[in-house]
Curated annotation (Swiss-Prot):
Single biological process term from Gene Ontology: L-histidine biosynthetic process
HAMAP family: HisC_aminotrans_2
Residue numbers of N6-(pyridoxal phosphate)lysine PTMs: 226
Disulfide links within the chain: none
Reactions catalysed according to its record: L-histidinol phosphate + 2-oxoglutarate = 3-(imidazol-4-yl)-2-oxopropyl phosphate + L-glutamate
Name this protein carries in UniProt: Histidinol-phosphate aminotransferase
Molecular function (Gene Ontology), one example: pyridoxal phosphate binding
Documented EC number(s): 2.6.1.9
Pathway note: Amino-acid biosynthesis; L-histidine biosynthesis; L-histidine from 5-phospho-alpha-D-ribose 1-diphosphate: step 7/9
Pfam family, one: Aminotran_1_2
Origin species: Aliarcobacter butzleri (strain RM4018) (Arcobacter butzleri)
InterPro entries documented for this protein: Aminotrans_II_pyridoxalP_BS, Aminotransferase_I/II_large, HisP_aminotrans, HistidinolP_aminotransfase, PyrdxlP-dep_Trfase, PyrdxlP-dep_Trfase_major, PyrdxlP-dep_Trfase_small
């Protein structure tokens, strides 16, 4: 059978392994499996959100409000925007897909960091775009500028903070870079982990309204999957000027967000105390990781997210380490597919992190 020729160069995205898979493949009881692979919030979902979902469960026979009025209104009030500046997606990665289909076609150019969220490249290849990457692993804006001057770009992706490495650009450096970009180039600022970065360092905070007012060719993406603990509900959002939003809506299918997902997101926005408490605990536990990794003589990338990237250098092979941990019921993310001899570990609860340290010690002693 013939398929679109551009798919020959497309790799499928490798998601973090689910707990159910480990139970099936290794015969480990589900209560003994710890998942620290997908940057989910280990503290669960706000009790207020759970109560709202239970209340609305009886309405699942009805289609959702396709205008998404209440969620847009809540986001508009929180970020001082108009509802017309907002688009809602099934996760922020759906809005990434909208952006590429709205701006790119075969041989369009997309500029991104060498090591960043894999879906930028995958979605770009779906339309046959040319992918231009920096040579430096982390976001080097000087190199971005050089490549932009040389090749141009229809879209530039900036992941702030960056997944899967965890580093984060300063807001002022981002703004200086954006001043040099042509107004016909769409700049996607992926802020999936911005809540964490802004909590840790005010210099990393990007205000969505200021961003899109200052740079009308920019779109800011956020998600409810990380700090707001709604990974299973799949809700993301994009903020941009009306012209961008209107064109993205031409690609969106109706009813792309479920009734329960909309309600959960609205309720999650109300419980900032829960969110801030989770983020505070995250960075307290991250200190333990930094101390552990330093003591073991490994390298880590200072992280502004809810995960940490641990590099093994030439001492161990990350794929082997991740596999041995998996066999013991500990799921982490091997970064071999990103050409990194490293693992990415979600910062868990204290007891989960203690278990990770114990199992990692055991694995390393036997490799």
């Amino acid at each position: 059978m013939r398929f679109n020729e551009v798919l020959k160069d497309v790799s499928t995205y490798e998601a973090g392994k689910p707990i159910e898979l480990v139970v099936r493949e290794y015969g480990i009881d589900s209560k003994d499996v710890i998942k620290l692979a997908s940057n989910e919030n280990p503290y669960g979902t706000s009790p207020k959100v759970i109560a709202k979902i239970q209340e609305l469960a009886k309405n699942m026979c009805l289609y959702p409000d396709d205008s998404m009025y209440e969620l847009k209104d809540a986001l508009a009030k929180k970020y001082n925007l108009e509802s017309s500046n907002i688009i809602i997606g099934s996760g922020s990665d759906q809005i990434l897909e909208f952006c590429i289909h709205a701006k790119c076609k075969k041989d369009s150019k997309i500029l991104m960091a060498k090591t960043t969220f894999a879906m930028y490249e995958i979605y770009g290849k779906h339309v046959g775009a040319e992918i231009i990457k920096t040579n430096s692993e982390q976001h080097n804006l000087e190199e971005f500028s050089e490549l932009y001057k040389k090749h141009g770009a229809d879209i530039i992706f900036l992941c702030i903070p960056n997944n899967p490495l965890g580093e984060c650009l300063d807001k002022n450096d981002v703004y200086e870079f954006l001043k040099t970009i042509d107004k016909n180039t769409l700049v996607v600022v992926d802020g999936a982990y911005q809540e964490y970065a802004a909590f840790k360092d005010e210099k990393k905070r990007i205000c969505p309204k200021d961003l899109i007012d200052t740079f009308p060719n920019a779109i800011y993406l956020g998600t409810f999957s990380k700090a707001y603990s709604l990974g299973g509900m799949r809700v993301g959002y994009g903020f941009a000027q009306n012209e961008i939003i209107q064109n993205l809506y031409k690609i969106r299918a109706p009813f792309n967000i479920t009734t329960l997902s909309l309600a959960a997101a609205i309720e999650a926005l109300k419980d900032e105390e829960f969110v801030n408490d989770c983020i505070s605990k995250n960075f307290e536990e991250m200190k333990r990781y930094e101390e552990y990794v330093t003591k073991k003589g490994f390298e880590y990338i200072p992280s502004y997210t809810n995960f940490i990237t641990i590099k093994f250098g030439d001492k161990y092979v990350s794929k082997e380490v991740a596999q041995k941990l998996l066999e013991r019921g500990m799921i982490v993310r091997d970064l071999t597919s990103y050409k990194q001899n490293a693992i990415r570990v979600t910062i868990g609860k204290p007891e989960q992190n203690t278990k990770l340290f114990q199992l990692l010690d055991e694995v390393l002693q036997n490799l």
